[in-house]
Design a protein with these regions (language model features):
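Sec-dependent N-terminal signal peptides
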Residues: 4-13
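Exported/periplasmic cell-wall-interacting domains
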Residues: 69-142
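Short, surface-exposed linear segments at secondary-structure transitions and domain or protein termini
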Residues: 56-66, 101-104
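Tryptophan-rich substrate-binding surfaces of secreted polymer-degrading and adhesive proteins
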Residues: 1
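Intrinsically disordered, low-complexity
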Residues: 15-62, 141-142
Length: 142
């Protein structure tokens, strides 16, 4: 009886470790990559790439993504944060359009990378890209 109980406990621990490993593997596979030299975001699993607006201060590195609710105007109710520095949250969010003179919707469609480097460090994406990003866990900025 004791042997069976020990075996069951070992199997349970093994299954839990295996499940945990599978979850980690899955989460790491749900990665997006931003290429700052191209001002482009690519989904690692599907290889789909999309233009983005970025800034000269957009931090490089590997970050976990976290969905945040916000009531601030222009963000559509939420943003996907990836790095906090003092009072500033670097985030992926829908194209911010509250300052029409910045022409962000026009600039994100531009084939010129220089036109798409203009934010304060956040990464702006089209609405449909943003909705898809909610299913991803890791951001790598190169």
């Amino acid at each position: 009886m004791l042997k069976a109980l020990c075996l069951l406990m070992l199997l349970g621990a093994s299954v839990a470790a295996s499940a945990s490993g599978s979850i980690d593997t899955f989460m790491q596979s749900k990665k997006v990559i931003v290429y700052t030299d191209k001002a482009e975001l690519c989904f690692a699993d599907t290889k789909e790439c999309h233009p983005v607006l970025i800034g000269k201060t957009t931090p490089k590195g590997r970050f976990d993504l976290q969905l945040y609710s916000t009531e601030k105007a222009g963000y559509g109710g939420d943003v996907i944060g990836f790095k906090q520095e003092k009072d500033f949250l670097f985030a992926l969010h829908r194209v911010w359009t509250l300052k029409p003179s910045e022409r962000r919707l026009e600039r994100i469609r531009s084939p010129l990378v220089a036109d798409r480097i203009m934010t304060n460090g956040c990464i702006n994406v089209h609405d449909e890209v943003y909705e898809k990003l909610k299913m991803y866990f890791v951001l790598e900025i190169l």
